[in-house]
Structures are given as structure tokens and as C-alpha cells.
Amino acid sequence: QEAAPTEESFLLDKAVRCAVCDKVFKTKMIKRGRLKRLEADMDLRPRYEHIDTLKYSVISCPYCGYTAITRYFEHLSSMQVKMIKEKICVNFKPADNVEPTLVDYDTAIERYKLALFNTIGKKGKNSEKAYTCLNLAWLLRGKRESLDAKDPKMAEQIKECREQEEAFYAQAVSETPLPLPT
């Protein structure tokens, strides 16, 4: 019987150039070819066997603090670069630690929150804010599902995850009003 693949076997290191400070750094990316998609949740949260890909869908520059969901990371106007330098980079304190081999839920949640902060700081589109909030809600659900519900010590953390998930989900919906029929 074959052992289940590890989370690490789905990852690769990729060199990325920061759109703000122009420095190159390595980050973890998903090997898409190895993924086996499971049925999505009712709200279309993507689910895969053996790995939560959402944990690796944010890129964070360790030098200047610019952080965004992968699909938005490289697409910045010169005005947005200026706003990020003024609002994010000046307050950013680089961490001494290197990129972790595996990203845990708490680290991923912090990165998504930083991505949301960057999106607000660069005056990103409401759709980008909404997508970030939706991903954050999904990530919080993933964390909640990974906790042992039978452990009484986890009850408070599970409750907190559920409350934060609902708050970010509500924010995602409020950021993108549905088009009204004409």
C-alpha cells in the first residue's frame, strides 16, 4: 500500500521579483500537475486531496512587505507602487526568519491579512478586496476543519475561526454588490 503524499511533495521553490522594491526572493508555489481536485464546497471553495492550496496563494516580499494574492502580485501601476512604498514599506520590519518549508494556517492567515492591508493601501479594486476576503474566509474554514473538535481546548479556537470566517465572508459580499437587473 502506497503512503499518502506529503504536503511538501506538492511544493516547489520559485524565484519572484517584487514589483515594489525590485528585489528577487524565493517563495513556495504549488505544482499544479500533481493536484487531485475534490468536489468544491457550496460557495465554490476549491478543495484538493492532501493539501490546502489556499495556504500558498499569497506572495509576500520579505524585504519591503508588499504582499498580494499571486494573481495580483505583479500587476501594479506606478501610482500603486508609490502608495505601497508610502503606506506599507515605511512601516515594514523585515523578519529574520527564512521562508518556511511548509506554511501553516496561522502564517497563511497573517499573509492574507497583510495582502488585504496592501490592497487597501494601494487603493485596489473592490473586487480584489472582496476576493482577498473570500479567500481569507475559506482559509479560516480550512483551519477550523483541521482542528480537533473533540479537544475541549480547541473549542474556543474553532469558535473564533467560525466568527472570523463569517466576518470576512460578509465583507467579501459587501465589497462587490450584485448587479441590479435593468
How would you describe each model-predicted region?
Residues 12-14, 57:
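Short metal-coordination and nucleic-acid-contact micro-motifs, chiefly zinc-binding Cys/His arrays
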Residues 18-21, 61-64:
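Short cysteine-rich clusters marking metal-coordination/redox-active sites
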Residues 23-51:
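Short recognition patches in nucleic-acid-associated and regulatory proteins
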Residues 24, 67, 179:
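Cys/His-rich metal-chelating microdomains
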Residues 33-43, 76-87:
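Short cysteine/histidine-rich metal-coordination sites, predominantly Zn2+-binding motifs
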Residues 87-96, 106-114, 124-151, 174:
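Amphipathic alpha-helical repeat scaffolds of TPR domains
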Residues 101-114, 158-170:
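Helix-turn-helix repeat elements of alpha-solenoid scaffolds
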Residues 176-182:
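Conserved small/polar residues in nucleotide/adenosyl-binding loops
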